[in-house]
Amino acid sequence: VNRLGKTRTARLAAVGVACALALTSCSSGSGDSRGDDRATARQASAETTTTSSPTTSTSSSTTTAASGVRIVAVGDIACADGDRTTSTSCRQADTARLTRSLDPAYVLALGDLQYQNGTLAQFRSSYDASWGSLKPITRPLPGNHEYYTRGASGYYRYFDRSAPGYYAWNAGRWRIYNLNSNCDKIDCAAENAWFRRDLDRNPRRCTIVAMHHPRFSSGREHGNNPSVGRFWKVAYNHRVDIALAGHDHDYERFVRLSPGADAQPRRGIQSFVSGAGGKSLYHLGTRKRGSAVFKASVPGVLVLQLKRGSYTWKFRTVDGRTPDSGSRDCL
């Protein structure tokens, strides 16, 4: 190749990188113990983490080559219109205000977005009044409360999406899978086969899998969900980096775990429960193996900064604090 050819090649490569950072594309698809064990402690020490630090400023840059792509991930959000607001319930307007101040590129909405029954009228009267301005950047998935309306029709109509509700999309260099974990309502065997195929087609990428029901949770109301183990096994075998869920109304971070809850710092999936989106807050139940941080006193959202080969996380609360934060490299 001559000098001119090399120059043109370099310019095309630069353009390709810029486009990859700027664009997103989607594809659709029809043993517990209390406290942390020593393996958990060793893994936690390998992470860069900070807890209980106040936050005084927010960067307005959502997507740059240096900072990556900023995503807010949260579920369990809006009370029915007219329900009484307290310090710990019906705070959807406050979590929406916090999210707008964070200026994310995307909102990953983790299900149970509109209580009690997820009807279209409820979505329009409550969720839309608080989180509606964020709808253009929202990438939702359904929770169990969406199915309190037959076929989750209110959810699908409000977000202009189609059943069965699982799909993949790109955020910068990351691949993100929004799954439907309501396996009593859809064919999760077919979904899992689609999930496996798409992971096979996208090797060596930093990856997130998101669903409403968490594989692991210390929340008293629900706790662990073995039913989503099928998704975790596929994710683990393909070296998925992060698992996100809601369902329990709290914030919880786990160290990297196998589908069987073994701490695996160099191989496991790091999971977060981010269900403190406004509806209400639950209490701590039995602390599950691998649980590193549990917070359930103030509503808030999980903020992820997805970079090339790494990520950072922050749990931001509506009172302006950051009770948990840290960073990790991808697997």
Feature locations, PLM:
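Bacterial N-terminal signal peptides that target proteins for export
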Residues: 2-14
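Extracellular mucin-like PTS domains
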Residues: 41, 45-64
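Bacterial signal peptide processing site
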Residues: 27-30
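Residue-level marker for buried hydrophobic side chains located in beta-strands
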Residues: 71-73, 107-109, 140-141, 209, ...
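Active-site glycine-centered loops adjacent to acidic/histidine catalytic or metal-binding residues
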Residues: 76, 111-112, 143-144, 179, ...
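Extended active-site neighborhood of metal-dependent phosphoesterases/phosphodiesterases
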Residues: 82-86, 115-207, 222-242, 250-307
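N-terminal active-site segment of His-dependent metallophosphoesterases
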Residues: 63-122, 185, 190, 197, ...
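C-terminal motif of bacterial Sec signal peptides marking the signal peptidase cleavage site
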Residues: 23-25
